Amino acid sequence: MQVQLSESKNPLAYLLLIAPFFLWGTAMVAMKGIIPHTTPLFMAGVRLIPAGVLILMVAGFMGKPVPKSWLAWLWIIIFALVDGTLFQGFLAEGLVRTNAGLGSVMIDSQPLAVALLSFWLFQEHIGLWGWLGLGFGIIGISLIGLPQEWIFNLFDSGITIYTDNWQQLFNNGEWLMLLAALSMAVGTVMIRFVCQYADPVMATGWHMIIGGLPLWGISSVLESQQW
């Protein structure tokens, strides 16, 4: 059943439009609260695999076709590693090193990367106001994520970057959140190629399962006391 939200006057339709943003924000808070009781990579796998199984069950009930060609599975595997393993791995590790609110803001840099990738790959234009918004967004994300010393030095005496600054940048949670956002952006663009060979619902379910398995594998080697 197709719902025309733009033509509906039902208040529930507008709630459905903002629901993903609300659920996304609460997910960050929930993950931050769970991390002290488990390990980040194990938790990331738990986020993916059960949800993937549920999606496959729904897809089977809906009669969605199972991917059959090797190209379909190749794209699903690549999609899984980028949008599943890398995204959820960076996200979980980043939340260990930053708070949920700041982490959510850093993840919101993902639309900026999607716009740039779409312009490069598909020649999709967002117009003058879109690029202006992207510029303000990049400035805001930079002010949030870059070390304060870099920003102060830029206004005082130009950019002077030391080794300690690089170590601080690569070790803090904000940088990991940016890597998570970039992984999610690449995955968002990749779904267009995935859908050429596989049903999007089936591909989503399988990519969550396949993407979660490496997280559990890495967790079993590098982490302890997951339970």
Regions found by a protein language model. Give the residues of each.
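Hydrophobic transmembrane alpha-helices of multi-pass small-molecule transport proteins
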Residues: 55, 77, 117, 126-162, ...
